[in-house]
Amino acid sequence: MDSEHFIEWYPGNYGIALKIKNKIIEKESKYQKIEVYETENFGKMLVIDGKIQLLENGEKSYHEPLVHTVLLVHPNPRHVLIIGGGDGGTIREVLRHDIEFVEMVEIDREIIDISMDYLKIDNGILYNLINKLEPRANLIIEDGIEYIKNCKEIFDVIIVDSTDPFKAAEPLFSEDFYKYAYRALDEKGLFITQAGSLYFLTENAIETYSKIRKIFDKAYIFTSPVVGYVSPWSFVAGVKGNIDFKKVDLERAKKLKLEYYDPESHEALFYLPRYLKDRLLSLFRSENNFLSFRR
């Protein structure tokens, strides 16, 4: 990185570069290196361990498909669990729904403080969480896998908003974690996680999908372009019980006025490139007409 640009490299020497004005803060927490930059055209940028996490002008392109796909598919989401999400974008989107309560479990308090003080994409929710002022939400500073392993509560939806599967986030991509998540869901429940760049981290996406498919009753892999990431970006959803992941509640969706995720084009998210579809079929040898792959 020169003094004017931030570059994140992906496999194959393929990168994404942004022109920056200045570095706002750099801090080494117990778990990760956290940086915030002011970019030339995209507002503030959050970087963790050298990887772009979000751009202020465009972060909804990640948070909307992560959150609203599952919350609009679930017929009655009342209790939600977020693992990670310290920047505040995921809980901001969750609280736009008529839920009863959301539990947010974040391992690193430093990312919350930095996001609250410098990013400010959360509409004040992080401050309210820390000060116990948000009646529909609670914040727990804890390792997500330890929390869900010992959790006695039952949730309708579990959303994992983590960094890529390295260092502190690696256990969140393990079969054990997915087993705990399945157990923590109600008899009709949904789970979702990000799974990396489809083209440049293909094996990560396939591995994540494969593990979730082994644990959940159904599994779906879908993609959406994300500003600041090498897109298309992949997401994997796991279904417990009888929930039709093809069916979106369009009446609820109309009230949200989303900017990036289009519920009316929900099925388009699941159109996979031919090479990946063939790869999944060779591995699992079953499909339905919605490009989901069942165990």
Q: What are the residue ranges of the model-derived segments?
A:
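SAM/dcSAM-binding transferase cores
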Residues: M1-E35, S210, W233-R295
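Rossmann-like AdoMet
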Residues: M1-L72, R96
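The AdoMet/dcAdoMet-binding core of the Class I SAM-like
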Residues: D2-S3, L54-L190, F200-N204, T208
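Glycine-rich, charged/polar anion/phosphate-binding loops
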Residues: K19-N22, Q32, I145, Y220-S224
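Short gly/ser/thr-rich secondary-structure transition/capping motifs
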Residues: K27, L139-E142, A219
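Solvent-exposed alpha-helices and their adjacent loops that cap or buttress functional pockets
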Residues: K27-S29, I130-L133, V230
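A short, structural micro-pattern
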Residues: K30, E40, E106, Y229-P232
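C-terminal substrate-binding/active-site "lid" region of AdoMet-derived donor-dependent transferases
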Residues: A169-F245
